[in-house]
């Protein structure tokens, strides 16, 4: 190797070291805002998978199903699919409230009346053994009514935000309502659910 080539190699090595050092310094600079989920991958859920959950719900009469539960640093984010059939009048004590998990609904199809409000009548703790409590939305309460609740007429395309602690109550469903649910879990009370776990769940026959 000639002296000129050696000099070029050394120079390139020095530049690479300086560049790497600058990148590392930029990444760990304590004065900059830092990602709350550093180096976390994104999550993609295809429509075909969401549709498979809806088909399973209709075939097996399942209301609520968790598609994913994802770690995003300071919280878990759950993605659920919900299918509710016709409802002429609400069932007794069917007001729901979750202490720690907030929910966002995006209505896919159907129409329903949903009552929202924080003042729950005849509040009763939900059993801690319920699958929905353990896997989907954490501890909370049921109730018989929502005092001064506000009724919303939901239809396809609508979005509803339900903070933790707010009562929500379907009082009428015209034929059905199908909605995608985003569950925001800052206390990480719900277990994570991966794509592989989702596929295994969908592959199970009815009753398993």
Predicted regions and their residues:
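Bacterial N-terminal signal peptides that target proteins for export
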Residues: 1-12
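Bacterial N-terminal signal peptides
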Residues: 11-21
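A short, N-terminal "cap"/entry segment at the start of jelly-roll beta-barrel domains
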Residues: 25-99, 192-200, 204-208
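His/acidic/aromatic-lined binding-pocket segments of jelly-roll/cupin-type domains
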Residues: 96, 102-106, 151-152, 159-160
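Short, conserved beta-strand element in jelly-roll/cupin
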Residues: 99-114, 118, 129-141
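Double-stranded beta-helix
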Residues: 123-154
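Conserved metal-binding segment of the jelly-roll/cupin
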Residues: 153-173
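A short hydrophobic beta-strand segment most commonly corresponding to one strand
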Residues: 175-191
């Amino acid at each position: 190797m000639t002296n000129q080539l050696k000099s070029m190699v050394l120079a390139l090595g020095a530049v690479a070291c300086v560049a790497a050092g600058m990148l590392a310094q930029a990444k760990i600079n304590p004065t900059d805002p830092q990602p709350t989920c550093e180096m976390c991958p994104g999550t993609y859920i295809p429509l075909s998978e969401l549709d498979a959950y809806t088909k399973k719900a209709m075939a097996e009469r399942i209301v609520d199903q968790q598609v994913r539960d994802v770690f995003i640093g300071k919280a878990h984010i759950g993605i659920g699919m919900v299918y509710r059939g016709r409802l002429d009048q609400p069932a007794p004590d069917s007001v729901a409230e979750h202490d720690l998990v907030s929910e966002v609904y995006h209505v896919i199809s159907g129409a329903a009346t949903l009552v929202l409000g924080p003042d729950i009548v005849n509040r009763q703790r939900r059993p801690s053994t319920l699958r929905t409590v353990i896997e989907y939305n954490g501890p909370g309460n049921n109730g018989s009514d929502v005092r001064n609740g506000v009724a919303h007429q939901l239809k396809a395309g609508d979005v509803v935000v339900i903070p933790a602690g707010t009562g929500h109550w379907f009082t009428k469903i015209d034929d059905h309502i199908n909605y995608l649910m985003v569950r925001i879990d800052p206390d990480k009370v719900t277990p994570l659910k991966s794509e592989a776990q989702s596929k295994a769940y969908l592959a199970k026959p009815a009753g398993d």
